[in-house]
């Protein structure tokens, strides 16, 4: 059973976009790896900007600098 965990930085996708992403990932794994769609699990997690870092700085701090 494939399990795909995708983390998305907030602000995240809309409910409709998330549903489309889940359907697309499920279709990809089903087609490419011959897996039953019913066996594919997709988990989407929204992550706060202060919980993601690039180059030693949080995304929140990077965005704050860019907006000045």
Swiss-Prot record:
Isomerase in keyword set: yes
Database matches in Pfam families: Tautomerase
Keywords (A to Z) from UniProt: Isomerase
InterPro entries registered for this protein in UniProt: 4-OT-like_dom, Tautomerase/MIF_sf
The Swiss-Prot or TrEMBL record annotates one GO molecular function as: isomerase activity
Q: What class of enzyme is it?
A: isomerase
What SUPFAM superfamilies would the database entry show? Answer: Tautomerase/MIF (SSF55331)
Provide the active-site residues from the annotation: 2 (proton acceptor)
EC number per UniProt = 5.3.2.-
The question of whether Transcription is a record keyword is answered with no
Protein family according to the UniProt entry: Belongs to the 4-oxalocrotonate tautomerase family.
Q: What is this protein called?
A: Probable tautomerase Cj0270
